[in-house]
Design a protein with these regions (language model features):
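HotDog/MaoC-like acyl-thioester-processing domains
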Residues: 38-109, 195-254
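Hot-dog-fold acyl-thioester-processing enzymes
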Residues: 2-26, 81-188, 251-254
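Generic detection of short hydrophobic beta-strand segments and adjacent strand-loop junctions
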Residues: 31, 74, 117-119, 191, ...
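Hydrophobic beta-strand-centered segment that forms part of the acyl-chain substrate-binding groove
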Residues: 6-49, 53-56, 161-211, 223, ...
Length: 254
């Protein structure tokens, strides 16, 4: 099935229209995923035409038959407002008895911090995403002129959905261990540009931290914040929050 950040590319032209070039330098997209999408299913994305008084627009995506795919918010920094994931994290109940995620703690930092990463146009991005940015651009759901050639920032920009790939590229070094085998899925994601955009062929550092752990009747969830820093200046360029949920029923020892 499509890993949900695929849908983020469909929002970019709409959000560029609403927010202008600032979307690429300090835009924030925050989404809660509702239903899975498999290859070949059509997905329509929707964005409010103008920001509300807090500077925020609501975003959503649905399948052709109306099945909701995601709901969320988009906004500009430096204020950003209360994002979709901010709202959801504020409502989390602390969990006392995690099983699958029992080896994790809130505040835990990645053992590989800082992890060195970059994305070249032809670079294979690992086993989880076995393709290059160039291959992605040939098949991307919705392309943008800033992904190739010259841009206001010099060279090509890393596409919004590929920022997720960049931050997952070295995730094996984090030391964040869960018990398994069990079935996990992306439940939500937020990509916040602080001093963007992130560029192809630039060196970055990643710092990871677990910012929340939670559970529902069916799942255990972790919320991992990854900061993306410029390798030279050590300045924070972007922050990504990934909420991963693991199905309790899929773990044999539950």
């Amino acid at each position: 099935y499509k890993r949900q950040p695929t849908h983020f590319s469909q929002f970019v032209p709409l959000l560029h229209e609403v927010f202008g070039d600032e979307w690429f330098t300090k835009g924030c997209i925050s989404a809660h995923y509702q239903n899975m999408v498999v290859e070949g299913e059509e997905v329509q994305t929707m964005v409010e035409k103008a920001p509300d008084s807090s500077g925020m627009v609501a975003i959503s995506a649905q399948k052709r038959d109306g099945t909701p795919v995601l709901t969320g918010t988009a906004s500009l920094g430096p204020d950003y407002g209360e994002t979709e994931l901010d709202k959801r994290m504020a409502k989390l109940r602390p969990s006392s008895q995690l099983v699958i995620l029992s080896d994790l703690t809130v505040g835990q930092k990645g053992t590989g911090n800082p992890e060195s990463v970059r994305m070249d146009m032809d670079q294979h991005m690992g086993d989880m995403y076995p393709f290059s940015n160039k291959q992605k651009l040939e098949k991307i759901t919705e392309t943008h002129e800033f992904y190739e050639g010259e841009t206001p920032w010099g060279g090509p920009v890393i596409p919004l959905e590929m920022i997720s790939v960049l931050t997952q590229y070295t995730s094996g070094r984090s030391g964040f261990r869960s018990r398994g085998p069990a079935i996990g899925l992306f439940a939500g994601q937020q990509i916040k540009m602080i001093d963007g955009p992130l560029m192809i062929r630039k060196d970055y550092l990643l710092e990871r931290e677990i910012i929340a752990l939670s559970e529902s009747r069916r799942t255990e969830s972790n919320w991992i914040l990854t900061r993306v820093l410029c390798a030279d200046s050590k300045k924070v360029k972007a922050e990504v929050i990934l909420n991963s949920a693991t199905l309790k029923d899929s773990y044999a020892n539950y």
